[in-house]
Amino acid sequence: MTFVKKTRYLLAPPYCKTIETFISPIPNSPTETSGGLRLAGGWRCFKNLRVIQKKKNSLIEVLMPTQELLRVAKNYSKDSLNKTEFQIENLVNKRFPFAKLDMSKPHIMGVINITPDSFYKNSQVKNLKRLTKIFYEMVNNGASIIDIGGESSRPGAEKISVVEEKQRVVRPIEQLKNCKINSLISLDSRNLSTMKVCHKVGVDIFNDITAFKEKNKINFITKTFSPIIIMHMQKEPINMQINPKYNFAPIDIYKFFSKKI
């Protein structure tokens, strides 16, 4: 594990060849609806950045105004400025709709676990009557997506059979799709066979804790044009908390998702 040294000065100009540079926005107060740049074309603005630079095993963090970072890059080289502007544009650009949802505003996902061993007991559902009741409560409270899972992925959870997972989720999803509401239904599953069956009964989104690492899953979602949610974990749920190894988790996970996307 690498520790981050907080300092007032960069190791080097941003995005030069010998140093890795990463930036993240520091949002203004929620009541500050103007001033600075708009994050992802949405409702929050930012003027300042958290800049992290990595050289071998050394990490430093600098908090600085966006315009100051651009000034440093411009004074160094055209390449540094272009790369800095590109990364800031990635923060600012409006996001495309996801599963027809407008991503310029926040969305709530409700989670229903049709499992006996869920991490959060209040999300467990054991019969269809209670399932429908909870479903409508979530929708009425503003949930844009309802995520249905039949296999627990809590730390230490053991894998169940695909047959058992299907028995838990297919009929409930069929019932919920008949409710005629606007909220989308997401399937939380790592099994292609379950995904295929649930696609036939109308699931809108697939959410995979293994990040669709198998090629046959990628082929399936490409063929069906299905929206997906990619998750991150090390190893399997049963052993994911046994000595996980990160150099610096924010950067490690950022690189994981960058590669996946």
Identify the meaning behind each predicted range:
Residues 103, 158-187, 193, 223-233:
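Alpha-helix-loop-beta-strand connector modules within alpha/beta enzyme cores
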Residues 112, 138, 142, 146, ...:
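Conserved, mostly hydrophobic/aromatic
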Residues 112-113, 185-193, 209-212:
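Glycine-rich beta-to-alpha transition loops that act as phosphate-gripper elements at the mouths
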Residues 135-136, 169-174, 195, 215-218, ...:
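Generic structural signal for well-ordered alpha-helices
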